[in-house]
Amino acid sequence: MANQGQRVSWGDESTKTRGRSNSRGRKNNNIPLSFFNPITLQQGSKFWNLCPRDFVPKGIGNRDQQIGYWNRQTRYRMVKGQRKELPERWFFYYLGTGPHADAKFKDKLDGVVWVAKDGAMNKPTTLGSRGANNESKALKFDGKVPGEFQLEVNQSRDNSRSRSQSRSRSRNRSQSRGRQQFNNKKDDSVEQAVLAALKKLGVDTEKQQQRSRSKSKERSNSKTRDTTPKNENKHTWKRTAGKGDVTRFYGARSSSANFGDTDLVANGSSAKHYPQLAECVPSVSSILFGSYWTSKEDGDQIEVTFTHKYHLPKDDPKTGQFLQQINAYARPSEVAKEQRKRKSRSKSAERSEQDVVPDALIENYTDVFDDTQVEIIDEVTN
C-alpha cells in the first residue's frame, strides 16, 4: 500500500459490495482489542445491508484517520448438546489495525465491512488498538443508528474481574483437594489422641458439646429483633421508610411528593429495586453542604426549602430505574408497560449469556460507564 494514500470518496458506489466475499477470514486467538464497545446485530439482519458507509465511531483520531472496518464475531451456546446460534457482535477497528491490520481498504474479507468518512486518507492510521488494562469506549456516531443495531452498554469492570477470580478459586480448590484429604486424615488422628487424653483426665467432652448445641438452639429460637423503624413521634422529614406502605408517613403521591410508582409506594424498603434507587440519592453531607437553602415562617413553624443539583451517569441501568420513578403516579399505565418490557429484556439477556462459546475471531471487551450525564434537580419542602 502506498504510504501517501488517497482521499476517500464514495461517490455512487453501491453499499452492498463493501468488503463482502464468500472466502473464510483468517483465524487468530490473540485478536487485538477494539477501542470501542461492540454492536449486537438483531438476528436475521444483514450488517452489510444496514451499515452506513461512513459509520465510523466518534472520539479517536483526526479527520484523515476516520477510516476502518467492522469485524464480525459469531457466537453460540450449547443447549443439551445442541449448538444454538446467538446474535452476532461487530467490533470496529481503524485501517491498519486489529485482526486484519495487513488488509487494504475495500479488500473483500468474510465478516468484514469497510467504512470511512468522506475525505479520510486511504492509508494505515497507526492508531493501534486498546491495551488489555484500558476500558473500551461507548459508541457514538454523527448519524442515525439503524434500529437493528444494539449498542452494547458498558458494564462494571469489577464483574469481569470477579468472574475471573471465581474461576481461579475453582481451579485452586480442585488442585488442593488431594492435599486437604491427606491433612484431614492427619488432623483426625491428632483429634482422637487429644480426646483420649481428656477422657483420662475426667473431662467429658461429649456432654460439653451437647450443652453447647442446646444453648445455640435456644438462641436460634429466641424472638427475632424488630427492625421496623420507629416513626410515630418523629417529624415527617425525620421518618424512615420501612417495609410496607409509605403513604402512612409521607402521604399519597402528588406534585409535591412525586417519586415512586405503585410497587415502590406499597412496599417501601422491601420493593425489588429499592437498594438500587437508594444508591442514586445524595448523602446527608452532600445535601447539607451542596444545596441552596431558604426559609420562611409558616404559622408556628418554619418552612425550610432546599434545592440540590447533582448528576447521574446516563448509561447506568440504575439511572433509568431512578428516572422511571419520577412522576410515576401521573402515568401508571405507561410505567407498568415499561417495567414489563424491561423485565422481558432482562430475562432474554440472562438466557443469551449462558454457556456462550465464541468462535476463534473474538475479543472479550473491558467496559465501564460512559461520562455522559443527566441533570437531576430536587426541591424538598417537608
UniProtKB/Swiss-Prot annotation:
Region (RNA-binding): 33-159
Entry function: Packages the positive strand viral genome RNA into a helical ribonucleocapsid (RNP) and plays a fundamental role during virion assembly through its interactions with the viral genome and membrane protein M. Plays an important role in enhancing the efficiency of subgenomic viral RNA transcription as well as viral replication.
Biased composition (Basic and acidic residues): 201-235
Gene: N
Domain CoV N CTD positions: 224-337
Basic residues compositional bias, start-end: 17-27, 164-176
Residue ranges, compositional bias (Low complexity): 154-163
InterPro entries: N_prot_C_CoV, N_prot_N_CoV, NCAP_aCoV, Nucleocap_CoV, Nucleocapsid_C, Nucleocapsid_N
Region (Disordered): 1-29, 150-240, 328-358
Protein name (Swiss-Prot/TrEMBL): Nucleoprotein
GO molecular function: RNA binding
Quaternary structure and partners: Homooligomer. Both monomeric and oligomeric forms interact with RNA. Interacts with protein M. Interacts with NSP3; this interaction serves to tether the genome to the newly translated replicase-transcriptase complex at a very early stage of infection.
Annotated region (Dimerization), positions in chain: 231-334
Organism: Porcine transmissible gastroenteritis coronavirus (strain Purdue)
